Amino acid sequence: MSKYSGEEFSNNGDFYDDFAHTGDPALDMEYERNYYASRMPENVKYFLMNFCQAVKEGNLYDIQNMYENTFPQISDHHFDKSSWPEETEVGALVENDKVFMILYKELYYRHIHARIPGGPKLDQRINSFFNYCDFFNLIISAPNPVMLELPDIWLWELVDEFVYQFQNFAQYRARLTDKSQEEIQQLCVNHSNVWSILCILNVLHSLVDISNIKKQLEAISGGIDPNTVSGDFGKLSFYKMLGYFSLVDLLRVHSLLGDYYQAIKVLEPIEIHKKSAYSHIPACQISTSYYVGFAYMMMRRYADAIRTFSDILLYIQRTKQLYSTRSYQNDQINKQAEQMYHLLAICLVLHPQCIDESIQQVLREKNYHDAMFKMQCGDLEVFKSFFVFACPRFVSPCPPAADAPMEDYVKDPMEHQLQVFMDEVRQQKDLPTTRSYLKLYTTLPLAKLASFIDPNANDDDVSKLLIRLLCFKHKMRNLVWSKGPSGLEGTFKSGSELDFYIDDDMIHIADTKVSHRYGDFFVRKILKFNDLNRKLKNINI
């Protein structure tokens, strides 16, 4: 991985010239520590010192507790709409410990992105980028593995935040209407390499390579001990999990760029339709399914998209209590679940099929069926609104040209993907009507079907009907994954509830609909009733 240096950028922190410098480094450090400590609330000061000590000692239990519980609590209480203490203040408390300061700044800039009204300033975005570069250079460029222990949830959120800040910066960079000429010059010329797509891909691929995660996943699927191919770096959980999470975020990056084939391709070592030993972070598993399902939908593999969305939505229903204690994670997962219900509704309209009854029940309770009926009737505006709500926030890999007109280019990638999607929808918007007529008959003359669609039909309309029926056949025949580690593999299958062939001027129709299987539904209800009955019996009145 290429190294980057942030020396030319200042941190724009507060500087003070009233220190009583003695010339003795130890005394000066002690003075600065006491000076800055006096400016902080006591619980913040002790939290930072204990946090640093836990990182030094590699105490995973304490690190995870402070990261997941204490840090958010202090943020809510002291820094709800303001930033955490500056680097200089914290450095004086922890003796400028290099590793801890990089980790602290990662949390510091993440907090600014999430909490500060108006978002981060340009210099904060740049400084955050170079802090990530410092972290990745530290762990990737080292000749030997860095002995650093961090909980998996932090590693996932660190890598995912890295990609989020790239996405956020790309949108910020594309919005020229609220920037001065000097800011545009800095963004598009002076700092054109900051948060560049090449850097993001370089980092993620470097983490994948150094961890040998692909070889490890292939070994696991082949029943081989992954430690035989892991190498010195990959045998450590720290590097192994960073490599796995980088694969997932490569999926996200390629989806944001609209390269759906590559998005699925990069996950090939991961059997995405099977539960993995690495999928114990709910947010990671949900994010994976969201982007995989969306990529399948855009590739017109609706059956695979429906299966992906249905499986993960069932998982969310079962495991909601695992993340409900973390409000920010709960909000994020609920939003992504809502987006997936919208995408699932689109896929079911374009490719009707049976899904789990509990998912159907949610679609009914949240009134998705009304919108689905409108989409089936060809209402393109509903398709458009569902897509805009549920799709990722696409970005352009390149900044606007330095001499580009002063316009807002943020929506350009979104509008392009929307156009691609709507072109496909327009090709299919008449198919539900055709399907509804075919379902009523076992044999039907072409001329009669043409008259149903248009009472004033003539011979030309019958010829056009043949084109429509051919389109129906084509659109209902999808590539469907069946087995293997590659999500791109599959066999062509007809996903329609009916099939037909034409002999002379007669349509012969066969209903291939699979009847609902209610056994699983009743078993779940019985188990739920028994569980409720046990709880009632245990209540002491």
UniProtKB/Swiss-Prot annotation:
SUPFAM superfamilies found in the cross-reference section: TPR-like
Example GO BP: formation of cytoplasmic translation initiation complex
Cellular-component GO terms for this entry: eukaryotic 43S preinitiation complex; eukaryotic 48S preinitiation complex; eukaryotic translation initiation factor 3 complex
Keyword terms of this UniProt record: Cytoplasm, Initiation factor, Protein biosynthesis
HAMAP family: eIF3l (MF_03011)
Function statement: Component of the eukaryotic translation initiation factor 3 (eIF-3) complex, which is involved in protein synthesis of a specialized repertoire of mRNAs and, together with other initiation factors, stimulates binding of mRNA and methionyl-tRNAi to the 40S ribosome. The eIF-3 complex specifically targets and initiates translation of a subset of mRNAs involved in cell proliferation.
PANTHER family: EUKARYOTIC TRANSLATION INITIATION FACTOR 3 (PTHR13242), EUKARYOTIC TRANSLATION INITIATION FACTOR 3 SUBUNIT L (PTHR13242:SF0)
Name assigned to this protein: Eukaryotic translation initiation factor 3 subunit L
